[in-house]
Amino acid sequence: MPELPEVETSRRGIEPYLVGQTILYAVVRNARLRWPVSDEILALSDQPVLSVQRRAKYLLIELKTGWIIVHLGMSGSLRILPEETEAEKHDHVDLVISNGKILRYTDPRRFGAWLWAKDLETSNVLAHLGPEPLSDEFTAEYLFEKSRNKRTVVKQWLMDNKVVVGVGNIYASESLFTAGILPERAAGSLTETEITQLVATIKAVLLHSIEQGGTTLRDFLQSDGKPGYFAQELQVYGRAGELCRRCGNVIEIAKHGQRSTFFCRHCQH
């Protein structure tokens, strides 16, 4: 599933082609995604694009009359292509742009979403979200206070969007490894020093992944069709049974909240 770095990579890739241009109309070949494509998107006509933003794993395209909210789901990707590019089987939505390009949404598993909001304050999917991990609001003081008396294992807790947004399965495993914290520990057991290290590590891991264009494990592509390269630097995620690059012990796997967690018991405590 595309996580925060992949969504931010997509945002940065499509922004120069959209802002200042006009969306002439939308082509929707299959409206049956996770939720049906909003009627307002089906009816788009000559809408100037004011900005392209991100909140958590949602892309936010600001138009004069409202916002397109895009979630990439499990397998979605966005590409900028010449308008005449023929659609293939899993190409479900195109936004036709005034510069002769299209923004094409491809999603083999159709678990993404294209929604509409008159303003972001009224959007149900954006309500109750925690702070952005790369923002000044996400501090050690904030996370330490949130963690007190929490018995949930720290890996699962970090993936709660009410605590912090965008730290999905890959980056939770990688951040906990880099911070030296066992993912099976209760969130409330972490010391202030460990929380400080964890916050710094989450920010560093996410920033580095964005610099590498995200992580391509299955379907994610950047807006230019190229893969993300952070997968080549993964320390534990997806490496169960392989040797830890730091200590040489075997990487283990466990299930937390029905998600696979990867860790090194020697390097993490």
UniProtKB/Swiss-Prot annotation:
<dbReference type="InterPro" id="IPR000214">
    <property type="entry name" value="Znf_DNA_glyclase/AP_lyase"/>
</dbReference>
<dbReference type="InterPro" id="IPR015886">
    <property type="entry name" value="DNA_glyclase/AP_lyase_DNA-bd"/>
</dbReference>
<keyword id="KW-0863">Zinc-finger</keyword>
<comment type="similarity">
    <text>Belongs to the FPG family.</text>
</comment>
<keyword id="KW-0378">Hydrolase</keyword>
<dbReference type="InterPro" id="IPR035937">
    <property type="entry name" value="MutM-like_N-ter"/>
</dbReference>
<comment type="function">
    <text>Involved in base excision repair of DNA damaged by oxidation or by mutagenic agents. Acts as a DNA glycosylase that recognizes and removes damaged bases. Has a preference for oxidized purines, such as 7,8-dihydro-8-oxoguanine (8-oxoG). Has AP (apurinic/apyrimidinic) lyase activity and introduces nicks in the DNA strand. Cleaves the DNA backbone by beta-delta elimination to generate a single-strand break at the site of the removed base with both 3'- and 5'-phosphates.</text>
</comment>
<feature type="active site" description="Schiff-base intermediate with DNA">
    <location>
        <position position="2"/>
    </location>
</feature>
<keyword id="KW-0862">Zinc</keyword>
<dbReference type="GO" id="GO:0008270">
    <property type="term" value="F:zinc ion binding"/>
</dbReference>
<protein>
    <recommendedName>
        <fullName>Formamidopyrimidine-DNA glycosylase</fullName>
        <ecNumber>3.2.2.23</ecNumber>
        <ecNumber>4.2.99.18</ecNumber>
    </recommendedName>
</protein>
<dbReference type="InterPro" id="IPR015887">
    <property type="entry name" value="DNA_glyclase_Znf_dom_DNA_BS"/>
</dbReference>
<keyword id="KW-0456">Lyase</keyword>
<feature type="active site" description="Proton donor">
    <location>
        <position position="3"/>
    </location>
</feature>
<dbReference type="InterPro" id="IPR012319">
    <property type="entry name" value="FPG_cat"/>
</dbReference>
<dbReference type="GO" id="GO:0140078">
    <property type="term" value="F:class I DNA-(apurinic or apyrimidinic site) endonuclease activity"/>
</dbReference>
<feature type="active site" description="Proton donor; for beta-elimination activity">
    <location>
        <position position="57"/>
    </location>
</feature>
<dbReference type="GO" id="GO:0006284">
    <property type="term" value="P:base-excision repair"/>
</dbReference>
<dbReference type="GO" id="GO:0034039">
    <property type="term" value="F:8-oxo-7,8-dihydroguanine DNA N-glycosylase activity"/>
</dbReference>
<dbReference type="Pfam" id="PF01149">
    <property type="entry name" value="Fapy_DNA_glyco"/>
</dbReference>
<dbReference type="Pfam" id="PF06831">
    <property type="entry name" value="H2TH"/>
</dbReference>
<keyword id="KW-0238">DNA-binding</keyword>
<feature type="binding site">
    <location>
        <position position="150"/>
    </location>
    <ligand>
        <name>DNA</name>
    </ligand>
</feature>
<keyword id="KW-0326">Glycosidase</keyword>
<feature type="binding site">
    <location>
        <position position="90"/>
    </location>
    <ligand>
        <name>DNA</name>
    </ligand>
</feature>
<keyword id="KW-0227">DNA damage</keyword>
<dbReference type="InterPro" id="IPR010663">
    <property type="entry name" value="Znf_FPG/IleRS"/>
</dbReference>
<comment type="subunit">
    <text>Monomer.</text>
</comment>
<feature type="zinc finger region" description="FPG-type">
    <location>
        <begin position="235"/>
        <end position="269"/>
    </location>
</feature>
<dbReference type="InterPro" id="IPR010979">
    <property type="entry name" value="Ribosomal_uS13-like_H2TH"/>
</dbReference>
<keyword id="KW-0479">Metal-binding</keyword>
<feature type="binding site">
    <location>
        <position position="109"/>
    </location>
    <ligand>
        <name>DNA</name>
    </ligand>
</feature>
<feature type="active site" description="Proton donor; for delta-elimination activity">
    <location>
        <position position="259"/>
    </location>
</feature>
<dbReference type="GO" id="GO:0003684">
    <property type="term" value="F:damaged DNA binding"/>
</dbReference>
<dbReference type="Pfam" id="PF06827">
    <property type="entry name" value="zf-FPG_IleRS"/>
</dbReference>
<keyword id="KW-0511">Multifunctional enzyme</keyword>
<keyword id="KW-0234">DNA repair</keyword>
<dbReference type="InterPro" id="IPR020629">
    <property type="entry name" value="Formamido-pyr_DNA_Glyclase"/>
</dbReference>
